[in-house]
Amino acid sequence: MPYVVVFYDVSDNKRRDLLAKTLQSLGLVRVQRSVFMGRGGYTKAKEAIRAASRIVDARTDSVVALVVPEDYARRMLVYGGIMSDPKQKQAVRVV
């Protein structure tokens, strides 16, 4: 199953917090401050964009949902901790 990566630039704190909570409610996991990731394909990506369109201001904000094939996601390189796992001690991780 592919993965969905959602990243955003939202200027208003209230809208940004609401978007983060909404993405979490869709089953996505925060990997950086403005980046969420989870299993799902094109349908999940569209769901995330639809939800974002009800929250953000398209004149000043942007939200991108990217569908990544599973074999590409497994080759992801990570330096530093993943925000959803702040106790992670590994500096470099190959998924």
UniProtKB/Swiss-Prot annotation:
One biological process term in Gene Ontology: maintenance of CRISPR repeat elements
Record's subunit section: Homodimer, forms a heterotetramer with a Cas1 homodimer.
Keywords linked to the UniProt accession: Antiviral defense, Endonuclease, Hydrolase, Magnesium, Metal-binding, Nuclease
NCBIfam families linked to this entry: cas2
Chain's gene name: cas2
Superkingdom of the organism of origin: Archaea
Recorded family membership: Belongs to the CRISPR-associated endoribonuclease Cas2 protein family.
Pfam families registered for this protein in UniProt: CRISPR_Cas2
Cofactor: Mg(2+)
Disulphides: none
Lineage: Archaea, Thermoproteota, Thermoprotei, Desulfurococcales, Pyrodictiaceae
Name this polypeptide is given: CRISPR-associated endoribonuclease Cas2
EC number: 3.1.-.-
Binding site for Mg(2+): D9
GO molecular function, one term: metal ion binding
Record's function text: CRISPR (clustered regularly interspaced short palindromic repeat), is an adaptive immune system that provides protection against mobile genetic elements (viruses, transposable elements and conjugative plasmids). CRISPR clusters contain sequences complementary to antecedent mobile elements and target invading nucleic acids. CRISPR clusters are transcribed and processed into CRISPR RNA (crRNA). Functions as a ssRNA-specific endoribonuclease. Involved in the integration of spacer DNA into the CRISPR cassette.
InterPro entries found in the cross-reference section: CRISPR_associated_Cas2, Virulence_VapD/CRISPR_Cas2
